Amino acid sequence: MFVDKVKVYAKGGDGGNGMVAYRREKYVPDGGPAGGDGGRGASVILEVDEGLRTLMDFRYNKHFKGKRGEHGMSKNMHGKKAEDLVVKVPPGTMVTDEETGALLADLTTHGQRAVVAKGGRGGRGNVRFVTPANPAPDHAENGEPGEERNLLLELKVLADVGLVGFPSVGKSTLLSIVSAAKPKIAEYHFTTITPNLGVVDTQDGRSFVMADLPGLIEGAHEGVGLGHQFLRHIERTRVIVHIVDMSAMEGRDPVEDYHKINEELSQYNYRLTERPQLVVANKMDMPEANENLKRFKEALGEETKIFPVSAITKDGVRELMLAIADELEHAPEFPLHDSEEQVEGRVLYKHELPIEPFTITRGDDGVFELSGAELERAFKMTDFAREESVRRFARRMRKMGVDEALRKRGAKDGDLVRIMKFEFEFVE
């Protein structure tokens, strides 16, 4: 098992702007307000798809932005809500906010969903601001900005495919040429003492996880060599790729090797024999390989399909990877037996962005700088092209206590105050 990690950016769509509009009707002031609300922006949602096994797709697409809601229209017509952006992830994906380190979601079951970036609500049209004192308001809200955050997706990956065979038959070499894994390769036995895993991406767009497992020897089911450690890992795979050395340079007979390995698998756990097994005749670039392959085929019979390859020259490797991907499409899942690998009662954590109180700082140029989630949200939703909207924003700041706080910090009439990239004069 290894942990696959990828960083992605998600932003919910902004809400549509509310509209300032009036209907043309006799005896109604200014025709009466008739501006509709904007539509809600699209949220970015992660959804579990049990057909996915890796985070490979996120290597090429790391930015996810929801669409904006439609703007409000005249005649009290509201803008259309944007359709949520649903992003598929494999089971077992954990989602963390990169900035805060907070766990946002732990996605485990097919169809489970988590909203990771909410779409902004639509701005209200001028019909929403009617009062007895102001029956025809010339004010509407801009749409609320959608949430945005950088996320860390983590997936604990179990191998789909296990490479088995005696030591030094070429398992590590094969894994190194079909994936980005860098296993230790040397001309002595048991170079691999822990599983190496790599993600294989086939030419037709399919992907799977392959494990180069420690070499198996006789007596492994009784714990000889790395037996128990090896067999615990092979128990988790869905397809077994049995690699046999056709060169016979180690002094072993390919036919005997094949039967000995299968005997160890059957002795350890009868369920290992239920897994689909692809037989690979490796080291076909060596002098004696063709003669040994002929004898090997005769011993196994026509019903056993054998894939001749050379991990060194890469001959036959592409066809082998496609055959493995085909086999995986029909191979069933096998449950894990180790309690340490099972996670019970996983919880979907709902993350709510806390409302920050505003803060006041002084910039290097001496300008008072205002920041804070609630204040910046109100600022972004204000249409500063309309005088009534500007006055409303000023009243809201006073209600929040911003004016009083600026005075306590020494602000005087005419001093500059900056919100985001915009500057205003402080007026007593």
UniProtKB/Swiss-Prot annotation:
Cofactor(s) needed: Mg(2+)
Name under which the protein is recorded: GTPase Obg
Subcellular location: Cytoplasm
Gene Ontology terms for molecular function: GTP binding; GTPase activity; magnesium ion binding
Family: Belongs to the TRAFAC class OBG-HflX-like GTPase superfamily. OBG GTPase family.
General function of this protein: An essential GTPase which binds GTP, GDP and possibly (p)ppGpp with moderate affinity, with high nucleotide exchange rates and a fairly low GTP hydrolysis rate. Plays a role in control of the cell cycle, stress response, ribosome biogenesis and in those bacteria that undergo differentiation, in morphogenesis control.
Keyword Hydrolase: yes
Positions of Mg(2+) binding: 172, 192
UniProt xrefs under PROSITE patterns: G_OBG, GTP1_OBG, OBG, OCT
A Gene Ontology term for the protein's cellular component: cytoplasm
GO biological process: ribosome biogenesis
Complex formation: Monomer.
PANTHER family, sorted: DEVELOPMENTALLY REGULATED GTP-BINDING PROTEIN-RELATED, MITOCHONDRIAL RIBOSOME-ASSOCIATED GTPASE 2
Main location as per UniProt: cytoplasm
OCT domain: residues covered: 350-428
EC number(s) given by UniProt: 3.6.5.-
Top enzyme category: hydrolase
Species assigned in the record: Shouchella clausii (strain KSM-K16) (Alkalihalobacillus clausii)
Assigned keywords, A-Z: Cytoplasm, GTP-binding, Hydrolase, Magnesium, Metal-binding, Nucleotide-binding
Domain named OBG-type G: residues: 159-329
Binding locations of GTP: 165-172, 190-194, 212-215, 282-285, 310-312
Domain Obg: 1-158
